[in-house]
């Protein structure tokens, strides 16, 4: 063809058929593949169903394994405890119920338990008290400006990042981190030197800036520390012994901060925040006449919300239940007016001004728009439900304020006079027997108590010293003598706590609190002559039984609740609840002992010293936010958990891990099956992360605990009258029967004299 085109040839299949056959073959192949695909789909579905069955079986087995593991752990604990007793007896194995060791068995064996069986006992810890009246070497008053150390911006950023990577420190407020960075100072170490030495007391937190560090326990290498990592943080919470050594492998540079400065920063920032919020609230006409304790609760409830320019904080016409205080930035107020299509500007509000206060009284239809005028506007917010639960409804407050406002001119001295009159009435209630005992021991020498007393046995030992069972010579009158080593008190800077314990116990008179009769002192010890409660420690019984049933736990919790009710009415916070600090009298009633961490605080006030037992401390204590009576309610929740299970809910391999578990909270924690629904609800409500939300700290106070469903039907009046039989009833052979206490070896040597004179008024 002239155009050069080529006529196409028809393709032929090798068998001579045309291309149509190829199409048929493809169709057949597709059909075959579709059939195969359906078969595979069916096979996959079958396998998925089988996999689902396996997963369900695995889930059931996992639950069963967890239950068996828990049961095995409990039985191992009980077996170890009983083997300790058998080993000391040199006899054949004891047969006892895994759930309950009879009191008679405890009575026969507890005196034979060696000291190492107390390894499970929890010890309290404490920082130096914030008021160190009796510390003759206390440092000068803290000055933030003097503590600041110059750094360039890049160093500040690196230190800030290092602190924020730490599991504990990242929970602090940004301002607290900023102040820590400002006050950290450089410390250089030569190759081969120790930054931290195992067994020595710690006082500093460090950030590694240059060089190489390695961590040792004994001679064993544990790890190395990366650059810009924080370490040693436990030492800034309280006086503790280092559990490992940190050695410089090269020359190193660190940034350091000591405990005293850290605690002053925490207290300074929190107090400044509270004071600012308090001033804001005092400017609100609705709230300005509320008493301090109510204002403090509102302050603790306030949350911070942030808005950017143009954001509507309140919209006109909407129903609202939230009250706002402007903490930072400016907002504009606009309102619909006749003759205008758009809302018109009414005014501008600035820091310290407030809006929406009517919402605290009743449902409020917003009468205007509130719009952020700039970025990063900060508002302090509280809603009506929170306000009503923690502070009270408007009607309740109105009734309260009528009496309060009528007495606004009454000064603090008159209020304290009223309280002291109340205390005088309490002192009148002292039994004749107690008055006679006080008169008897008042005649003893103040510096030589053992001229008139003889030691019968040791009831307990601790870092402070010992508690001895003593009796009056030639008389059948017994006491417990707490002997506190003066040198230990000075070394740990606990003079204030010892004096506080003395002062507080001297004014108390409750059947749920151990009584103090007299104090003494010599060159080596200060002494407290206490009521002898010889029913034994609750901790020892819990150790031997493994856990308590619900009726026994309820009785224990009720005794503690009555003790807290009495203390809190007097303005006293306890701060060290645990089974180790609960002791039984002859009738099996519990009494609080060891008031070393107790403190009297004013209404609506907070205290700042880190103290307590690690497994029992509340989050606000760990974070140095300041704390009040609500920490006792937190610890009550932990106690309920431990009584029912044998172990506290938060317990890590070291104290810092325990604190991090506490800060994560109890809300998402799975409870063991032995804790039923009602006690679980009580524990969760007592252990709220926010102190203002805790049961006992709401507007109805401790009555909310007494009326909780788990304690429904409990005979509170019988408990207070001591007519309610105790499930822990004891049988004592006489006033010096100490068979319910563990046996302790004699004290090795005598402590050195301590003659600084801090105890002159003891």
UniProtKB/Swiss-Prot annotation:
UniProt-listed PANTHER family: CYCLIC NUCLEOTIDE-DEPENDENT PROTEIN KINASE, PTHR24353:SF24
Active-site residue numbers: 576 (proton acceptor)
**Reaction equations catalysed:** L-seryl-[protein] + ATP = O-phospho-L-seryl-[protein] + ADP + H(+); L-threonyl-[protein] + ATP = O-phospho-L-threonyl-[protein] + ADP + H(+)
Chain residues that bind 3',5'-cyclic GMP 2 = 347, 356-359, 366-367, 412, 415
Q: What is this protein called?
A: cGMP-dependent protein kinase 2
Q: What is its EC number?
A: 2.7.11.12
What residues does the Protein kinase domain cover?
453-711
Per UniProt, subunit arrangement is: Interacts with GRIA1/GLUR1.
Coiled-coil portions: 23-85
Q: Where does ATP bind?
A: 459-467, 482
PTM summary: Myristoylation mediates membrane localization.
Role summary: Crucial regulator of intestinal secretion and bone growth. Phosphorylates and activates CFTR on the plasma membrane. Plays a key role in intestinal secretion by regulating cGMP-dependent translocation of CFTR in jejunum. Acts downstream of NMDAR to activate the plasma membrane accumulation of GRIA1/GLUR1 in synapse and increase synaptic plasticity. Acts as a regulator of gene expression and activator of the extracellular signal-regulated kinases MAPK3/ERK1 and MAPK1/ERK2 in mechanically stimulated osteoblasts.
The organism encoding this protein is Homo sapiens (Human)
Q: What is the lineage of its organism?
A: Eukaryota, Metazoa, Chordata, Craniata, Vertebrata
Q: Which residues carry this modification: Phosphoserine?
A: 110, 117, 431
Q: Give compartment(s).
A: Apical cell membrane
**What InterPro entries does the record tag this protein with?**
AGC-kinase_C, cGMP_dep_kinase, cNMP-bd_CS, cNMP-bd_dom, cNMP-bd_dom_sf, Kinase-like_dom_sf, Prot_kinase_dom, Protein_kinase_ATP_BS
